From Swiss-Prot:
Top-level taxon of origin: Bacteria
Biological process annotations from GO: protein catabolic process; proteolysis
Membrane-crossing segments per the record: none
InterPro entries the UniProt entry points to: ClpS (IPR022935), ClpS_core (IPR003769), Ribosomal_bL12_C/ClpS-like (IPR014719)
Organism: Caulobacter vibrioides (strain NA1000 / CB15N) (Caulobacter crescentus)
Disulfide bonds: none
Family membership noted in the UniProt record: Belongs to the ClpS family.
Protein name: ATP-dependent Clp protease adapter protein ClpS
Residue ranges of the region described as Disordered: 1-20
Role according to the record: Involved in the modulation of the specificity of the ClpAP-mediated ATP-dependent protein degradation.
Subunit-level organization: Binds to the N-terminal domain of the chaperone ClpA.
Gene that produces this protein: clpS
Length: 109
């Protein structure tokens, strides 16, 4: 005759609790994209850049451009690292193609 083992695992009696662990995801760091004032880039080009690469209205672009002109620097927008890096590169590339010394940088928000 077959022997039966008493107790232990696998006898089908008992209960178990399964807890679902939700991973904690961090929000990505945000970066401010800044335009720096210079004495050579035309104001209209700065407005163009703000409209083209930052989707600003003419009114918002003009307001930001005047802020940059008066204060030396202005925030164009706040983005994740990759987006901010791309926008900085687009602005600098466009400025170079149009032969303007416009500078654009990013800093952690």
């Amino acid at each position: 005759m077959a022997e039966r083992k008493q107790g232990g695992q696998g006898n089908g009696v008992g209960s178990s609790v399964v807890t679902e662990v939700k991973p904690k995801t961090q929000k990505p760091s945000l970066y401010r994209v800044l335009i720096l004032n210079d004495d050579y880039t035309p104001m209209e080009f700065v407005v163009y850049v703000l409209e083209r690469f930052f989707n600003k209205s003419r009114e918002d672009a003009t307001r930001i451009m005047l802020h940059v002109h008066q204060n030396g620097v202005g925030v164009c927008g706040v983005y994740t690292y990759e987006v901010a890096e791309t926008k900085v590169a687009q602005v600098i590339d466009s400025a170079r193609r149009h032969q303007h010394p416009l500078q654009c940088t990013m800093e952690k928000d």
